Regions:
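Pre-Walker A-like glycine/lysine-rich segment at the N-terminus of P-loop NTPase domains
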Residues: 1-45
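Alpha-helical initiation/capping and key positions within long helical/coiled-coil segments
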Residues: 20, 38, 59-62, 156, ...
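Alpha-helical structural signal
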Residues: 36, 40, 57, 143-144
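Generic alpha-helical structural context detector
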Residues: 41-45, 120, 144
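Short amphipathic alpha-helical segments enriched in hydrophobics
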Residues: 43, 47-51, 172
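Nucleotide-state sensing region of NTPase/ATPase domains
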Residues: 48-133, 137-138, 147-154
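An accessory alpha-helical subdomain
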Residues: 130-188
Length: 188
């Protein structure tokens, strides 16, 4: 899968932008703060339904604006299914008061997890050196993101695991506050 084009609207430091990519090699050159990493983050967002920095969607909307929209065009070189198209359009929209929406060829996904792995992507940025020097949390997040793209069952199990972990931690917090378990907490 190769990216062919990208349109950004009110994403991070971009009011709007339109990019056409070479099939071979693309280089982004500019001074600090010009948006090179934000451009890469937009591509990542279209593939993973989130920013690579793990921030809330509100934090990727351009300052003092209400929404953002990303539109990416990809070339599917491995037409796995006979009916699959060679060109794919992915749109990501975040608007106030609405759920995030990801569309493939103008059809919205019911669950964002259905999209993960459609366009495999790995991003490595200078801060990722922390994976080697800091704790295991960053390494685990990197591996989870990568493996989730390769194996849909892994992603489903990861979502379930994180949900159960959140419930367990909430139950332990309630227990610490009340010093008692009730039937609801025991089920968790």
């Amino acid at each position: 899968m190769k990216i062919q084009g990208l349109k950004l609207t009110q994403f991070k430091n971009y009011d709007s932008g339109q990019f056409v990519f070479s099939e071979r090699l693309n280089c982004f050159v500019g001074k600090n703060g010009m948006g090179k990493t934000n451009l890469l983050d937009a591509i990542y967002y279209l593939c993973m339904c989130k920013s690579h920095r793990g921030v809330n969607d509100r934090n990727v909307v351009k300052h003092s604006t209400e929404f953002f929209r990303l539109e990416g065009y990809f070339l599917n070189e491995k037409k796995i299914e006979k009916k699959s198209k060679s060109k794919i359009k992915i749109v990501a929209k975040v608007q106030p008061g609405k759920n995030k929406e990801i569309e493939k060829d103008d059809v919205a996904y019911q669950k964002l997890s259905e999209h993960i792995g459609m366009i495999p992507v790995v991003i490595i940025v200078p801060d990722d050196t922390l994976m080697a020097t800091e704790g295991s949390e960053e390494r685990r997040r990197f591996l989870d993101n990568t493996l989730s793209q390769l194996d849909g069952d892994y992603l489903k199990n990861l979502i379930t695991y994180n949900k159960i972990l959140k419930q367990r931690n909430s139950a332990l917090k309630k227990f610490a506050e009340t010093r008692s378990f009730n039937a609801e907490l025991v089920d968790i």
